Amino acid sequence: MEQLNEIIAQIDDFVWGPVMLVLLVGTGIFLTFRTRFLTWRNLGYALKSTLSKEARTKSRGEGDVSPFSALTTALAATIGTGNIVGVATAMVSGGPGALVWMWISAAFGLTSKFSECMLAIKYREINAKGEMSGGPMYTMKKGLKNKTFGAVLAWLFALFAVIASFGIGNMTQGNSIAGALHSTFSVPTWVTGIVITVVSLLIIVGGIKSISKVSSIVVPVMAIFYVICGMIVILGNISNLPSGLAMIFKMAFSVKAVGGGLCGSIVASMMSAMRFGVARGVFSNDACMGSAAITAAAATTDNPVRQGYINMTGTFWDTIVVCTITGLAIASSGVLGMTNEAGEMLTGSDVTIAAFKTILGTSGGWLVTIGITLFAFSTILGWEYHGEKAFEYLLGTHKFNMIYRVVFSLVAYLGCTQTLSLVWNFSDIANALMAIPNLICMLLLSGEIAKDIQEFQSEIHSC
């Protein structure tokens, strides 16, 4: 088993290596140019639409949930432990300059997220239960000219999505919650497992309407809560912020390895900052993965482009706002390069906790733990819907969705109580493999994306 785990880990490192990252960001760059930078030029319109009263209603078009609820449900799956743990890991491994490359990947990820969500709504279907069913698998099946090729891509995407939903969308999140609560509050992992299983089942059993109802409340509250706490830390260390920002940009674009200052013993170059920043940026904002498009397809809208813009802002909120707060809190606190009692360099959540403790004391650790718990739990809810719809596509019927919901909730208990590195690595591979069919689909339909977004310009100009 240990040898198998080693092999799977090596495959995981390969599929998430430089080639995949170049493909992910490269597709975003290509689509941004192909659409004439309209996603950047219309970001203000997208944010305004997201925060409008109309986005919270189902008054325009057909769908299962409001445009805002579709976004928050997608964000529930997107804003996760990566926003706290992932950012810290990137800044330790690639230096603080990794934060800049997270921003760059997010900038081009806006167009990727817009494209996959817009296409998902355009090619969605209504199932026998009267609910919307959509996502990259339906886009591939209905949108690609070669139907056989499209059907194969769709089946592969759905299969990998189901596998990823149980791993990266469920067990890894449950393990993060259990670990955080145990280390901070000494809560037994089995107790956390039972609570997560029961609470998630109570929400999930109600389907997308129940999940979106909870997400539309929990996601904004938890994000605002975390941002406020992070801002307090940043303002408390405001005297260090200028030098922290200077080091962020210096290490982001320095050809030679540099370090020192607020970075402690960390030394990094542009290449390492780029590698870890882009990787964590993609992991965090989920652009090109295709999962957010599954939720977008449930939105009530009269135009796929309109909802594409709304769902596109998920990348903005996730990376440009939440990840930035974590990054600046760490950069201004001087905790990078610090070691623990054993002489080991702090990494992951320990770095973020140390940063928050510089101003908030012991309560800073509690707040980060609460943040990890809320972020990870919301990820479980969002990923359940993604996996359920992929499962429905594979079987060709919605009749077994309830079985999936129950099994998904029970698996969360295993994630909280067991160490399943083999399953996690395998699901991480599945998450990467989801992207390949999705990237191919978006590139083949790039002309259609460019045409639709250009035609919608008249609607924006009339606002």
State each model region's role.
Residues 1-81, 91-98, 109, 409, ...:
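N-terminal alpha-helical transmembrane segments of multi-pass membrane transport
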Residues 3-4, 34-39, 82-87, 165-178, ...:
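Transmembrane helix-loop junctions in multi-pass membrane proteins
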Residues 23-30, 34-47, 157, 174-181, ...:
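Membrane-interface loop-to-helix entry segments
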Residues 27, 31-32, 105-130, 136-137, ...:
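Helix-loop-helix module between adjacent transmembrane segments
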Residues 37-65, 89, 94-99, 103, ...:
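Flexible loop linkers connecting adjacent transmembrane helices
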Residues 57-93, 119-143, 156-162, 263-316, ...:
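Alpha-helical membrane segments and immediately flanking helix-loop junctions
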Residues 108-116, 194-208, 219-239, 271, ...:
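Selective recognition of specific alpha-helical transmembrane segments in multi-pass small-molecule
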Residues 116-124, 128, 229-249, 255-265, ...:
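Extracellular/periplasmic helix-exit of transmembrane alpha-helices
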